[in-house]
Amino acid sequence: MADTASERTRIAAPAERCLAIALDFERYPQWAKDVKLAKVLERDEHGRGSTVEYRAAALGRSVHYVLRYDYGAMPESFSWQLVDGDLMRTMDGRYRFESDGDETRVHYDLAIEVALPLPGMLKRRAASLIVNNALKDLRAACEASS
C-alpha cells in the first residue's frame, strides 16, 4: 500500500518561472540535491519530457526509476506515474502552481510504495522527506533565478 504526503510552499517567483524550472528535468541534478541523473527518454509534441529516467539518493542508497508525465491540466499542474523502478512499486505525484502576483503557491502531492521491508513509520517519513526536500530545492532554484 502506498504512503502519501502532501505539502505546499510559497515561492517568491512568478508561476511561469516555477513551472519552467520544474519542467526542465535534465537540469534537476543542478538544483535538486538528491537527483544525480535525469535523462529525458521521450518528449511529447510540445517538446516536454513525457518519459524521464532518474537516478537519485534515497534511503541511503542509489535508486533508479522512470516516470511518465501527464500534462492534461497544464499550466496549473502536471502529474507523473512510475513506469519502472528498482526500489519502488509506486511513485505517483503532482505539482500544482497557483499564481499570486509575483509569488507562487506550489502544492506537491506524492504517493509512494517502497519495495523494501521497512516499518510503516519509516515509509511515511520517507514520503514526507521527499516532498519536503523537493519543495525546498525547487523554492531555492526558483528564487535564485529571479
Locations of regions flagged by a protein language model:
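Hydrophobic residues on conserved beta-strands that form the core of alpha/beta folds
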Residues: 6, 106-107
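Alpha-helix boundary/capping detector
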Residues: 35, 44-48, 78, 95, ...
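Hydrophobic-ligand binding "helix-grip"
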Residues: 29-33, 40-44, 55-105, 111-113, ...
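Short, well-structured hydrophobic secondary-structure segments
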Residues: 50-52
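Hydrophobic ligand-binding cavity/cleft-lining segments
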Residues: 1-47, 133
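A conserved amphipathic terminal alpha-helix motif
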Residues: 111-146
